[in-house]
Design a protein with these regions (language model features):
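Mono-ADP-ribosyltransferase
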Residues: 1-196
Length: 196
């Protein structure tokens, strides 16, 4: 999709529903322009498009609820559906993570959802980190410790590989990644998973 058409779709979505957030459309556009000026080598190397970068920033800045809902259900506004398409494309282009263990969160805080199952299909995009300290001071949410598949089979992509401060990487698993539950700690709400 051409970037101007993508932005028109974003604007129409904002008018239907405050979707991208009050004033955020300009912020995301500015983020894309800054990224283009500072990382043209990355854009060229991975053939990234402006709509893909726009959605990447939406996902990284935690304005992704409707994108995640659309990713898991297939239902959503035309803009949400386009965002899912663009983010799928983005993930298909960016590097696979070479880390073996990741740390993620399920904000639902419902560890009992995992008690009677051995595997599950995570329909949304799972955002994770290579840094365990994301668990520090966490009061709510189920904590995931994720063991990755072999590097040639994993669906874990590095989504901020150009800016890994302190060797910390932000990872995103493709939607519909399947996981096996290895260990469940109901008291501390920690689930150890293996990507299947």
């Amino acid at each position: 999709m051409v970037y101007n058409d993508f932005l028109k779709l974003a604007k129409s979505s904002i008018q239907e529903r405050i979707y991208v957030g009050e004033g955020s459309l300009d912020t995301y556009r500015e983020n894309v322009e800054t990224f283009k000026s500072e990382h043209s080598d990355i854009i060229e190397k991975y053939s990234l498009t402006e709509p893909e970068l726009f959605v990447m920033f939406m996902m990284l800045i935690n304005n992704s609820d409707e994108i995640q809902q659309c990713a898991s259900s297939g239902n959503g506004t035309p803009f949400a559906k386009e965002c899912v398409r663009q983010y799928d494309s983005f993930l298909s282009k960016v590097p696979i993570s070479d880390n073996a263990i990741f740390y993620g969160l399920d904000p639902s805080d419902r560890v009992e959802n995992y008690v009677n199952i051995s595997t599950f299909n995570y329909k949304r995009y799972m955002i994770a980190s290579t840094r365990q300290s994301i668990f520090d001071n966490l009061k709510n949410g189920v904590k995931y410790i994720i063991n990755k598949r072999r590097i040639d089979k994993t669906k874990a992509h590095e989504v901020m590989w150009w800016n890994d401060a302190n060797n910390t990487k932000t990872i995103c698993f493709e939607r519909n990644t399947k996981f096996e539950i290895n260990r469940l700690d109901r008291i501390n709400k920690i689930i150890e998973l293996t990507e299947l």
